[in-house]
Amino acid sequence: MKKHTGTIISISGFVLKIEFNESDLPEISHALEYKTHQGTYLAEVVQHTGINTVSAIAIGEVSGLARGTEVVNLGHPIEVPVGESVQGRMLNVYGKAIDGKPEPEAEVKWPIFREQPLLRDLDTSKEILYTGIKVIDLICPILKGGKTGLFGGAGVGKSVLMQELINNISMMGGNSVFTGVGERVREGIGLYKELEASGVLSQTTVVLGQMNESPGVRMRVALTGLTIAEYLRDEEKKDVLLFIDNVFRFIQAGSEVSSLQGKIPITGGYQSTLSKEVGDFQDRIASTKDGSITSIQCVFLPADDIDDPSAVATFSHLDSTIVLERSIAALGIFPAVNPLQSFSRALNPNFVGERHYQLAVQVKYVLQRYTELQEIINVLGMAELSDDDKNLVHRARKIRNFLSQPFYVSEKFTGTEGIFVEMEDLLESIERILDGTYDDRSERDFLFIGSYKDLK
């Protein structure tokens, strides 16, 4: 097949304007190959700007690129290797190896742009995926085949919580895909080594587009990871775990690309196509009758603003929302999850059972009432409260402390062994705190324990 070539006629940042013969004009989203002194890279056609010119976003480096450079129209979108050959590997946005090993020898490659599953093919059955993390399993349980978001500002523990979820859920078996979107290089390398040490790397694919790379890379690497997960679901009929860290960086990269194209932004400087871009991405993360994709996504909150447009655009697509709060982290309680702001569609007696549901509702009531009483305590002190309110405050503080937990992935930093808490032990512990069994115990006794069995 003859490959059509074009010539770069202008370069503005990562935006390339390319001239082709009128009959050879590439389609929108098709990949164009170009070379610099650093290597061979791809660009993606985003706009037809004239009868024989296109605008493309570089998915790679542009240093050393000059006008007059020849580009090759590949005739299809970016395609990445999928299947067994990429299991246990660390890849970049093109699906090329970045783990120092030979390139994956894939028999099959899939384009990163795909249609979402048809409505008639979707699987609507619901099953709870237990994580062993108390606050998540109690307040915002995760649905198998659902989408879960971890929301929080900088430094409140999103990535650590994500790594603990990867550790706990991956140990149960199955295939996993971790996609690092615009995150730190050391986090990706650290995760890769932890997966290797724990013995689950052989069933995991790590895809990285780091924060030092171009906005085109950060915008498309999420689709690379998703495509690998879709192949496992559709062709190998497997249940897949898809971890994405961080969805905000995916949105931010789209905003940068939009600005480079000269498009007018909306509130907060985001791209006008924000809702559509997030929707197109999230709609592909679905469970079908063949297999499921269970997605856990970190979402950074700029300035801790839960109403930021990037967070709002993501909320409506999620089944479970886990909100991490700085004020809880400041108390030294980790994971710093706010049970009052976190919720899950799975917290329903039909899914979790009547006992679990009622205990979760009681916990939320006690913590909400404690929040209301906190203002009185701050001004007048505990002495002004009724005896019932004093008991409620002490129980609320015990519950708050009890929902802390030592993690396996942070053992080497804290010196405390991680704990996986079984559901029955969790519910029994909450029942005992709420019914006053431990009213004579200190609140500090409940910090970083597993269950009531660990009370001495």
Curated annotation (Swiss-Prot):
Annotated protein name in UniProt: ATP synthase subunit beta 1
Gene: atpD1
Enzyme class: translocase
Matching Pfam families: ATP-synt_ab, ATP-synt_ab_N, ATP-synt_VA_C
UniProt-annotated location(s): Cell membrane
Membrane topology designation: Peripheral membrane protein
Subunit field text: F-type ATPases have 2 components, CF(1) - the catalytic core - and CF(0) - the membrane proton channel. CF(1) has five subunits: alpha(3), beta(3), gamma(1), delta(1), epsilon(1). CF(0) has three main subunits: a(1), b(2) and c(9-12). The alpha and beta chains form an alternating ring which encloses part of the gamma chain. CF(1) is attached to CF(0) by a central stalk formed by the gamma and epsilon chains, while a peripheral stalk is formed by the delta and b chains.
EC number(s) on file: 7.1.2.2
Main location: membrane
One cellular component term from this protein's GO annotations in UniProt: proton-transporting ATP synthase complex
Similarity section: Belongs to the ATPase alpha/beta chains family.
Keywords, ordered alphabetically: ATP synthesis, ATP-binding, Cell membrane, CF(1), Hydrogen ion transport, Ion transport, Membrane, Nucleotide-binding, Translocase, Transport
Reactions that this protein is recorded to catalyse: ATP + H2O + 4 H(+)(in) = ADP + phosphate + 5 H(+)(out)
Database matches in InterPro entries: AAA+_ATPase, ATP-synt_VA_C, ATP_synth_F1_bsu, ATPase_a/bsu_AS, ATPase_alpha/beta_chains, ATPase_F1/V1/A1_a/bsu_N, ATPase_F1/V1/A1_a/bsu_N_sf, ATPase_F1/V1/A1_a/bsu_nucl-bd
GO molecular function: ATP binding; ATP hydrolysis activity; proton-transporting ATP synthase activity, rotational mechanism
Binding site for ATP: G152, G153, A154, G155, V156, G157, K158, S159
Organism in which the protein naturally occurs: Listeria welshimeri serovar 6b (strain ATCC 35897 / DSM 20650 / CCUG 15529 / CIP 8149 / NCTC 11857 / SLCC 5334 / V8)
Keyword Transport listed: yes
Origin superkingdom: Bacteria
Job description of the protein: Produces ATP from ADP in the presence of a proton gradient across the membrane. The catalytic sites are hosted primarily by the beta subunits.
